[in-house]
């Protein structure tokens, strides 16, 4: 019997990633995660819709123009949570209860510290960063106000993210979905209350978001606290295990740096959009929200690939790791191509959800033309780094993603775009960067896979 075949008894929320058929379990894992991401974006879209409908285009541009900047601040620490997910999945599959418990408590304390740091940095540097992005004068005050309120909720946001990463590591994506539905509905209702009834505009949306993050945090931590088993949270046991913290950083820090740098390129892109004025900014805000639905759909498959790979790496099943990647490639293509085509053909109708302004809709469609039907490329691009992170290899994929995605976009923004100033030309940089990065990531994966297979097969033989 292979190590880990029957080590861990699964409860009704968990998925056995190491035995049996793969595709149906990938779908069972990915679907709640996909729905969670879509619902989160729908609830975030409520922010945009409410301020756009009831506070005007300036408020809409103010909230939307902060997205890329907020992601630069937060994605470093969210990326580190992937390290917690990989390490926890590996220990859980191998039945190492003590190591699993240490990982949980290290991760939660790390999340709290990270959230406090993020809150401090966001409140202090919000306006300075917005000025560096050339945010127009007519929206910068509202943008800074929204960012400062938003960042006050960072401790809650980080705790719920890291807690959900632990649950995903054991195959539980259903309870985080339920928690999101509860907190998201609260967010939507609070937004309507603060904006329409209290007339707080952008500030009301920010306050509603912070309260909903607190609700999500309480639900996730309560779930971990009441869980019986190796991933039970005991507040008295919160401490940092330096060895496991190092392993979390080895996988998570490169992923976080990659995400942060990529979002920095999006900040440069946002600055380029800002140069077209508030109409283009509003169009980009609406299109970016639609674009986000595509991302969370394929990202759910990437998360599944990483978690499944990590657990099978923990129980030394290299051939099953290969089958996981192939099935993930098929699933990602089907999901991303179908949703991309839908977003393209129904683009005008989807954009009208956010605004009735025909000029804003026209700008939004110029962006969607080149970033929807081709989005399956992005899905395939992310799978290979996801599989490598599941094996504990994160450094080289980070470097290649930065070179392929960020490097090309910077060259595009400062080299090609100034000579051909249009939104269409600006956003062709997306599929171009995806193609370049795929070529590099596949080459890297091939060499690392051979090394990992030899290592695992050698250990199994011993």
Locations of regions flagged by a protein language model:
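Residue-level signal for transmembrane alpha-helical positions in Major Facilitator Superfamily
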Residues: 27, 31, 43, 80, ...
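Residue-level signal for short hydrophobic patches within transmembrane helices
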Residues: 19, 23-42, 46, 69-76, ...
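Helix-terminus/linker motif at the lipid-water interface of multi-pass membrane proteins
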Residues: 42-61, 130-137, 193-200, 260-293, ...
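Small-residue-rich hydrophobic transmembrane alpha-helices
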Residues: 60-120, 157-176, 283-341, 345-347, ...
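Short alpha-helical transmembrane segments in multi-pass integral membrane proteins
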Residues: 1-30, 88-153, 197-253, 309-374, ...
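Short runs within selected transmembrane alpha-helices of multi-pass transporters and secretion channels
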Residues: 81, 150-168, 176-187, 205-220, ...
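Transmembrane helical elements of multi-pass membrane transporters/channels
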Residues: 28-47, 149, 160, 183, ...
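Hydrophobic transmembrane alpha-helices of multi-pass small-molecule transporters
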Residues: 72-75, 187-191, 217-221, 293-296, ...
């Amino acid at each position: 019997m292979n190590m880990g075949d029957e080590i861990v008894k699964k409860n009704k929320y968990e998925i056995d990633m190491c035995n049996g058929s793969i595709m149906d379990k990938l779908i069972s894992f990915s679907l709640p995660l996909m729905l969670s991401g879509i619902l989160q974006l729908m609830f975030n879209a409520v922010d945009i819709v409410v301020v756009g409908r009831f506070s005007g285009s300036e408020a809409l541009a103010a909230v939307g123009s902060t997205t890329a900047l907020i992601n630069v601040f937060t994605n470093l620490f969210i990326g580190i949570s992937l390290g917690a997910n990989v390490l926890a999945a590996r220990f859980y599959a191998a039945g190492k209860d003590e190591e699993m418990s240490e990982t949980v408590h290290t991760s939660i304390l790390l999340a709290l510290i990270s959230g406090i740091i993020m809150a401090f940095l966001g409140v202090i540097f919000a306006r300075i960063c917005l000025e560096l992005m050339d945010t127009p004068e007519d929206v910068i005050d509202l943008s800074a106000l929204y960012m400062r309120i938003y960042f006050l909720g960072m401790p809650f946001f980080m705790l719920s993210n890291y807690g959900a990463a632990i649950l995903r590591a054991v195959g539980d994506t259903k309870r985080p979905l339920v928690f999101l539905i509860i907190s998201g509905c609260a967010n939507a209702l609070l937004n309507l209350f603060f904006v329409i009834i209290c007339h707080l505009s952008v500030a009301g949306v920010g306050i509603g978001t912070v309260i909903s993050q607190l609700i999500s945090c309480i639900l996730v931590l309560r779930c971990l606290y009441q869980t019986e088993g190796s991933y039970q949270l005991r507040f008295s046991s919160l401490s940092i295990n330096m060895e496991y913290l190092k392993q979390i950083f080895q996988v998570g820090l490169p992923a976080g740096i990659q995400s942060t740098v990529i979002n920095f390129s999006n900040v440069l892109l946002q600055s380029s959009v800002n140069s077209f004025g508030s109409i283009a900014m509003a169009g980009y805000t609406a299109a970016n929200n639609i674009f986000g639905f595509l991302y969370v759909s394929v990202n759910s498959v990437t998360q599944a690939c990483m978690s499944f790979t990590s657990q099978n790496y923990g129980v030394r099943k290299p051939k099953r790791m290969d089958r996981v990647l192939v099935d993930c490639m098929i699933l990602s293509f089907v999901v991303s191509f179908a949703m991309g085509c839908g977003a393209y053909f129904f683009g005008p109708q989807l954009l009208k959800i956010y605004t009735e302004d025909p000029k804003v809709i026209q700008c939004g469609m110029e962006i969607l033309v080149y970033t929807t039907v081709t989005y399956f490329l992005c899905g395939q691009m992310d799978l290979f780094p996801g599989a490598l992170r599941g094996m504990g290899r994160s450094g080289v994929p980070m470097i290649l993603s930065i070179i392929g995605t960020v490097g090309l976009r910077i060259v595009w923004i400062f080299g090609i775009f100034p000579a051909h100033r249009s939104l269409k030309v600006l956003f062709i940089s997306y599929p171009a960067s995806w193609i370049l990065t795929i070529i590099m990531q596949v080459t890297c994966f091939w060499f690392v896979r051979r090394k990992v297979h030899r290592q695992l097969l050698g250990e199994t033989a011993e």
